[in-house]
Amino acid sequence: MLSPAERITKKEMERRYGLVRSKMKEADLEILLVSGVRFVGSIGYLRYLTNWAEPFAGETLLFPVEGTPVFFARTSERALLVENLLGGMETVTGSTAPIVAEYVKKTGKKKVGICGLRTMFADYYLQLCNELPGVEFKDHSALMDEVRMVKSQEELHWVDQSAKLGDTAFKLFSSLIQEGREEGEVFLEVEHLVKRLGAENVYFMMAADPKPVAKFMDLAFDHYEKGDLIFFNAEIAGPAGYYTQLVRTLSLGKPNDEAAKAAEVCLKTLSEVDGMLKPGVMTTDIYRAIVESIESSGFKMGLHSGHSQGLDIFERPLINDSDAVTLKENMVIVIHPHVLLPSGGGMWMGETYVVTTEGGQRLHRSNRDLNVL
């Protein structure tokens, strides 16, 4: 396990501070109130500016457009850890809304952005509003999203390390599948390996059925049988907390014609999108290309088709028909077309890319084909 100092350099943190403060000035913000909770999709905003990987609910950062950030820790012990291991911030013991509100009052600032409302508990937000009636609160999560979308070279190094763990996980998983084995047993072996190799967090989805429907570890009680289509979805946060996603479908025995055709459609769709992942391309155009590729082949799309990842498992830009974002070099994009099978269930393939001027750079090396066991 890496120490906080090994996860991020001082130069990288200074880069982030500079970019966020530049955006704050453009938005006429004096303070950004950054929240986060320990959940795979709700930690990234706070961690991005603090390097604090395990926030309790309510722990918050007051990030000023100028001056030293202030971290509100839940307990004195946690405040001491932040001060000694992370540094660069003033620490305050206590992270309740009244404590934070009192500090904001002392600054005299009135233009406070919140990042983000979806990572802040409703009662906390309501208390802030009650304690600070004269303060203008606005959600500025998009401000941080814009900064976080484009990864630095340091971040991309850790993204690549995470992708390697995904390939390692799939290699072991493929070797463990056999009739009669329980899903959960197999995935626990995979989790043990990748965590020994430095993964911070692992999030699996799986299925084992002729008509597979994706589920989570709490439902991984099925036993593998001949004729099953088997989902492997591993979203792994590597040694510095950056996620990548690898999705593959395997067949225990020869697949039927419907499954084989759906697998071909998934692969065709991935191949077509590979070349679209360039700077200047709109995410909505990629989404339409995925839908067109699937529907022109006589199938329908199932699960959502893609998104970005980073310190959160699910980040903007999203690959859908509404989050219209122009791709930039060094964005990290996951594409995972899911094709519905007419008889039930679906076929699912996907992986993580880096946007480059030459098209999507594949980070995973695992075979894309429908693996027949």
Where are these regions (language model features)?
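Active-site neighborhoods and metal-handling regions in enzymes and metal-associated proteins
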Residues: M1-L373
